[in-house]
Amino acid sequence: MQNKIIIHGARAHNLKNIDVEIPRDKLVVVTGLSGSGKSSLAFDTIYAEGQRRYVESLSAYARQFLGNMEKPDVDSIDGLSPAISIDQKTTSKNPRSTVGTVTEINDYLRLLYARVGTPYCINGHGAITASSAEQIVEQVLALPERTRMQILAPIVRRKKGQHKTIFEKIQKDGYVRVRVDGDIFDVTEVPELSKSKMHNIEVVIDRLVNKDGIRSRLFDSVEAALRLGDGYLMIDTMDGNELLFSEHYSCPVCGFTVPELEPRLFSFNAPFGSCPTCDGLGIKLEVDLDLVVPDPSKSLKEGALAPWNPISSNYYPTMLEQAMASFGVDMDTPFEALTEEERDLVLYGSGDREFHFHYVNDFGGERNIDIPFEGVVTNVNRRYHETNSDYTRNVMRGYMNELTCATCHGYRLNDQALCVHVGGEEGPHIGQISELSIADHLQLLEELELTENESTIAKPIVKEIHDRLTFLNNVGLNYLTLSRAAGTLSGGESQRIRLATQIGSNLSGVLYILDEPSIGLHQRDNDRLIESLKKMRDLGNTLIVVEHDEDTMMQADWLIDVGPGAGEFGGEIIASGTPKQVAKNKKSITGQYLSGKKFIPVPLERRSGNGRFIEIKGAAQNNLQSLDVRFPLGKFIAVTGVSGSGKSTLVNSILKKAVAQKLNRNADKPGKYHSISGIEHIERLIDIDQSPIGRTPRSNPATYTGVFDDIRDLFAQTNEAKIRGYKKGRFSFNVKGGRCEACSGDGIIKIEMHFLPDVYVPCEVCHGRRYNSETLEVHYKEKNIAEVLDMTVDDALVFFSAIPKIARKIQTIKDVGLGYVTLGQPATTLSGGEAQRMKLASELHKRSTGKSLYILDEPTTGLHTDDIARLLKVLERFVDDGNTVLVIEHNLDVIKSADHIIDLGPEGGVGGGQIVATGTPEEVAQVKESYTGHYLKVKLQQ
C-alpha cells in the first residue's frame, strides 16, 4: 500500500488546480488565512472523495438514503482510505440528545442498572426483591431450629370498609383463621369492622415449627399463600418478627411496584421509562409568575396582570373587576400587598365558587352568566394548549418558561426507574450518576461497593463505561455531565465528544478529517488533546487537521500552508513540509509567525475606561459560586478560564440576558443572580456570534450590510432606468418585476435525481444571473446589477469610490478582512468566522454613540494569527469610540491585548465558578493560582 495520498488538479471553490502529496499514518495540519481554501482542500476535496468512493460501493437502494455525494472537482486522488469527518456543524439540537446518549455511555449505564441494580421502595420500606416459592422456602428453612411460625396470605392492605364479603369468601374456601389488624380471630367470630378506618386482613394458611422433614408441607403452604395473596406472603415468627416476601418486584407494605429490570426501563426516550409528566425531557413549559406579574408593586387596577391588560378588548379586565368585587378583593391594593389567599385566587382561580359575569362586546354580543373565576395562570395555560391561533399561542408562550419538571426533578425518568440503586440504598440512582461531572463519575466507579456476584456481572460493563469516560477526560471535557443537553454544547465541545467516541472505537487504517478541535480549549488542556490525536495516529490512522493553534502546528508530523491570501487571492499551496521547514519558508505567512518574524505586539498602554461599571452581585447559575463581578465600561475586557469554569454562564446566561431584559424588554430569563447595577450607562447591547447571517442563498454580504439598498437606489437613478420607469424594486431578485421568473431569482434550478444526488444547474434563461434581460440592460459605469454582485469587495471598493455612502459600507467589509468575498456570495457559503466578521462590518458603519456593549464569544474561531491581528484592530476601533467590548476567549494574543481580564476557575465544572484573578494582563500574569496567568506570563515575555 502506498504511503502517501497524492492529489492532482484540485479545483474546489478557490483552489487553483493544485497538486499536493500528504503522508499517510501521520498527524497532518492544514493551515492558512481564513478563506484561503483549507476547508476546500480538506473537506470538499479529500473527505468528499473518500466518502463518495465508499458510498459508490453500496447498492443503489442503500445509496438513496445517503443523500448528496457529488464528485469533487479534482483530476485524481490516490492512496485514499475510508474517510470520517469530525466537524463542528453537526451538533444535535434535539432536546432528547445528551452527552450520555451521544457517547453511548447511557446504553452501558442502563445495562449496569438492569443487571446489578436493586429497587428500593419510594416510601422508605426498604429493598424490593422478587423471590420464587423455592427461594422463599430456602430462606424460611434457614431460620433457627424450633422457630415457631405462621404463614399468612395478605388479602386486604390498608383499605377502608367492613369487608364482609371477603370474610364470607375466606370461609367458603375452607380457611379457619384470619388475622385482622394484628389480632387472630376465628373466621366466624370476626368483630364488625369500622367503615371509616383502614384495615389489614391476612389469612392464616398454616402454623409450623422449623424442624427436619417440613420442606414438602412448607412448600405447599408457601405456594397456597402466594396464590391467595396475589404473589405476596408474610411469615410471622411468633416472637414479634415478620418477614415479607413477594413474587413480583413490589413492596409488600405499600404495594409500590417495579416492573422487571431491563435496560429500556432506564431510557428516558422510551415510554416504558420516561417521566409521564415531562415525557422524558426533564423540563416542562410552565407559566412563569415573574412574567405574568412583572411589577408586583402595581395594583390590579393599574394592570399588574400582564396577560390581561386590554389590547383589543376589555373582556378580561371587566371579568377581573367583577370577580374581585364579588370575592371582596381590593383592586387598588398593590399585588405584593394582597394576602396569600387573595393572590392565590387571582392567579389560580376560585375553584367551585361562582360570581356573576356581565359583558357586552363592541358588536353588541352579550354574556350574562354565573361562572367560577378561572385565574390568570390557569387562563394562560388553557389558552396556550387549546387555541388554534398561532398568534395567541405565541403571545401566551411569552408568559411561560421552561422550568425543571416537578415530578422527576429534571432526571427525566419515572419513579420505577429512579428507585433502582447500585451499591446499596445509599448508592446513586441512574439520574444522580448522570448529574455527576465526568471526573467525579470516574471516581465513583472506582469506589462502587458491589457483592462478589454483582462484581462479576458488572466488570465488563464498568470497563466500557470507564474507557469512554477516560477518553472524554483526556480531551479536556472532565467538567461535563452525562445529562448535559447536546444542544447546549459549543462547536469545540461537541467535536471533542465525537473525537472521544472515535478513539474509543479503536479503528485503524481510517482517514480522519478534523476542523479546529482546539476551539474552546484552554492552553492547559491543549497538550491532552494533542496526545489524544497522536494516540489515534499511532493506531495506524491518518489525521488531517484544519487548525490555527500554534502548539498543534508545532507538534504535527507534516504542515501544509494554503494561501497566500484569502478568496481568489488564495487557493495555492505556499508551503508543505515539517513544521521546522515551513517556519523557514519566507513566502509563508504562517511560517513567519511560527519563526517569530511576525507577531502581534503587546499594546503600549492599557485604557483606563470611563470610570463606570456594570456590577453583578450573587451570580449563582450552574457552577458559579455566588460571584460579585464588576465589568469596567469603556474598556476591552476578556473573560478567561479553563473550559467549563463558568465563562459562558456568567456572560451569556446572566450578563447578556439581564442587560437584554432591561434594554430590549427581552422575555428570555437570565440565570440566577442577586442584583445588577450600571445598565443605565449603556444604550445598546450587540451580540456578535458565529451563527449564519442568513439561512438561505438569497441572503448575501450586500443585503446583510444594507449596501445593496444603496446600490439599487443608484441603478434606479441612472438615465436608462428613469426612461424605462424602473424603481429600485426592479433591481431586487426577491420580488417579481426585475428578477428572472424561470428560477425565481435564484440563478440555479434544482433537478431531483432520486438514486443519484440532486443536481443544481444554472438557469437556462438567465444563465445564473438572477435577473431578466430587460433589467440587465440598465448599466452604471458599463456594469449591470448582476456584474456588480459578482464583484469582490476589493473590486467594488474601487468601482464605487466616487459614491461615499456606498464606499463607506464596503470599506467596513474590507476592514474586517473580507475583501475577497463577492457582494452576492450566498450567506450559506460563509464560514462561522466570516459570518461573525460580516456582523462586525455591519456594526462598523453605524454611527457610534459610545454607549454600546459588544459581546463576542470566542471571536478567533476559524481565524489565522494574521486574521486575529486584523480583528483586534476592528475591536479596538469600537473601544476607542468609547464603547465596551467583552470577549470570551482562550487565544493568548487576544487576551494580552485586553485592557482588563476576568479569569474564572480554578478548574472546570464543580471545581470552577470562582474569580481567580482580575486586572490588566500584566497583573493577572503575576497570580500563581491562575492557569491563564501562567501561560500569559510566557506570552508577554516573548
Curated annotation (Swiss-Prot):
Signal sequence bounds: none
Binding site for ATP: 32-39, 641-648
UniProt domain ABC transporter: residue ranges: 308-589, 609-937
Keyword Nucleotide-binding part of the UniProt annotation: yes
Keywords: ATP-binding, Cytoplasm, DNA damage, DNA excision, DNA repair, DNA-binding, Excision nuclease, Metal-binding, Nucleotide-binding, Repeat, SOS response, Zinc, Zinc-finger
Entry's localization field: Cytoplasm
GO cellular component: cytoplasm; excinuclease repair complex
Xref: Gene3D superfamilies: 3.30.190.20, ABC transporter ATPase domain-like, ABC transporter ATPase like domain, P-loop containing nucleotide triphosphate hydrolases
UniProt key word DNA-binding: yes
Chain intervals annotated as zinc finger (C4-type): 251-278, 740-766
UniProt xrefs under SMART domains: AAA
Record PROSITE patterns: ABC_TRANSPORTER_1 (PS00211), ABC_TRANSPORTER_2 (PS50893)
Molecular functions per Gene Ontology: ATP binding; ATP hydrolysis activity; DNA binding; excinuclease ABC activity; zinc ion binding
Entries under InterPro entries matching the protein: AAA+_ATPase, ABC_transporter-like_ATP-bd, ABC_transporter-like_CS, P-loop_NTPase, UvrA, UvrA_DNA-bd, UvrA_inter
Subcellular location, principal: cytoplasm
One GO BP annotation of this record: nucleotide-excision repair
NCBIfam families in the record: PRK00349.1 (NF001503), uvra (TIGR00630)
Similarity field: Belongs to the ABC transporter superfamily. UvrA family.
Official protein name in the record: UvrABC system protein A
Organism: Streptococcus pyogenes serotype M3 (strain ATCC BAA-595 / MGAS315)
Organism lineage string: Bacteria, Bacillati, Bacillota, Bacilli, Lactobacillales
Recorded name of the encoding gene: uvrA
